[in-house]
Every structure is written in structure tokens, then in C-alpha cells.
Amino acid sequence: MKKCLLFLTTIALILSLSTNAFAKNTSGDLSQKQALQLALSAREHFWNTMSGHNPKVKKAVCPSGTFEYQNLQYVYMCSDLGTKAKAVNYLTPIFTKTAIEKGFKDYHFTVSKGKLAVPIGDGDNLLNWKKSTAKLISKKGSTITYEFTVPTLDGSPSAKRKVTFVKENKKWKVNQFDAVI
């Protein structure tokens, strides 16, 4: 009898803990800390995609050379992001589907010879997102907007950036490809 009671108590405890963890994981809220973490991840994914390579992937093959298309100089993406499907797969955990589609269009990504290519750009900026602060400015259903105050690396005045997060497939995502640059 004692074993049965101990077993039932253990099961009840496990169920209550797992239910609690599940509730926290699917919470409707996106905290300031979570918003900043997601913004930092979006920034990293944006710049990695614009440079054509995720540096965390070892042994990716990066083609050399450039080509011109519609008066823009392009470079092929490295093998880790070398097809549209691979790049979309890399961006999907962070950005909404709409943000990815619009980003590919706005930034003139193209497919040439079966490979994804990106226009050659000028690189990063002087915003220090790691030291930014977030303020909730709008919350409507599955859409939350935070305004970030982002200090600069060179000491000039901080920049203000509004970033909208949308819950897509039960996960918060950034709703604009270049929101965190």
C-alpha cells in the first residue's frame, strides 16, 4: 500500500511539474529579456544571411567570385545557405514567413545556376544591441511591439528602433527582416 501511495504521489508531482513547465513555455507574454534575446538572434541571422554564410557551420564551401545581375554585384552564398530552402530553413526559427519573403525581395536575393546569391553590401553598423534596453509599447493579441534604445559603439546618441514580434506556430518571431540592424 505504501509503495502504491508513493507511486501515485510521484506521478502527481511529475504531472504538475510538466504542466507548469508547459504553461510557461506557451505563455502569451514575451518579456523584455526574451524580446532582447530574440532581437539579438535576429540581428545575427540577418548579418549572417547578408554575408552569405553562418560562421557557426564548419566545413561550409564558399564559392569565390562575383557576377552582375540587374546592375548589382552579387556573390553566391556558401553551401550552408546556398539554396533558398536552406536559407529559409535557417531564418524560419527567428523570422515570420512574411518577413523572410519580404526580406528576400527587398534585399534582391536571386537564384543563379541553382544557387542562392546575395548582392554585395557594406556590412555592419555601429549599434551596440547587446547593451540595448526594451520598452513595451504595444500588445494586441499575438502581436507585441517593443521600442529598443540602442547605444552606439562610437558614443554618438542612442538610436531608437521599434521591433514587432508575432506569434507564429506558437513561437514568437520577428516580423521584419531588417528590424534589428
Swiss-Prot record:
Domain of life: Bacteria
Keywords: Signal
Expression triggers: Negatively regulated by the two-component system YycFG.
Keyword Transcription regulation tagged: no
InterPro entries: Endopep_inhib (IPR031841), TA_system-associated_sf (IPR053749)
Keyword Zinc appears in the UniProt entry: no
Protein name according to UniProt: Uncharacterized protein YoeB
Gene assigned in the entry: yoeB
